[in-house]
């Protein structure tokens, strides 16, 4: 069984406040992006055989182990993971891989297992990737409301800098906190091809830690991309294009400074098809 594990971008991310448990309350819009890792998941008689980076420490391996245990060890599995989504980019690659493993194993070994409960133990972004579509998220990202997002041509750019998510959150200051995102206004702007009124509260701390990230927005805007924003805790940025050709030209130009992909964000189901 082959599955695609799509990347995500945050169409705005507002850090509302720091909670008593030490985590930050968030309000964000998740959108799948067409860049994807590739997974091959096959049943075997016994054991958990994983071929991919980090071995047993990989979130996809941990997801498989959790599911097989919860399902009563119905059989074994062999997993091949081909990484395309860069690490430390804020694109959710590891979380997406884990979600697709859970979905694949449920298809191979059906059982009364709460996938969302397992996903929450693996990471805050994993439940979103089970949905396979856009979503509004609150809490630390685990409280989800599905959203219908229009497909938008876009470019994702990774400058090659790995940014540890915990480091960015530790650098958040009270002045970085923001109000709820204007969800309806963002959706309307996307549908009309206009600049969405979103922001990312994590840009401030990320820019303080890594000042070189400030240059990225200017480079992308100079290529005619609109709504340029850092995704998650960085270091990847995305920008909205006028059309597929514009996206391809912009991505080609950006490859002089890092890795770039032209594709589509939002739209219909993501992650369910073959590679």
Curated annotation (Swiss-Prot):
Keywords in alphabetical order: ATP-binding, Isoprene biosynthesis, Kinase, Nucleotide-binding, Transferase
Reactions accelerated catalytically: 4-CDP-2-C-methyl-D-erythritol + ATP = 4-CDP-2-C-methyl-D-erythritol 2-phosphate + ADP + H(+)
Sites where the protein binds ATP: 86-96
Residues of the active site: 8, 125
Keyword Magnesium: no
Record pathway: Isoprenoid biosynthesis; isopentenyl diphosphate biosynthesis via DXP pathway; isopentenyl diphosphate from 1-deoxy-D-xylulose 5-phosphate: step 3/6
Biological process annotations from GO: isopentenyl diphosphate biosynthetic process, methylerythritol 4-phosphate pathway; terpenoid biosynthetic process
Keyword ATP-binding: yes
Top-tier EC class: transferase
GO molecular function: 4-(cytidine 5'-diphospho)-2-C-methyl-D-erythritol kinase activity; ATP binding
EC number: 2.7.1.148
Family: Belongs to the GHMP kinase family. IspE subfamily.
HAMAP family recorded: IspE
Function of the molecule: Catalyzes the phosphorylation of the position 2 hydroxy group of 4-diphosphocytidyl-2C-methyl-D-erythritol.
Protein name from the UniProt record: 4-diphosphocytidyl-2-C-methyl-D-erythritol kinase
UniProt organism field: Thermus thermophilus (strain ATCC 27634 / DSM 579 / HB8)
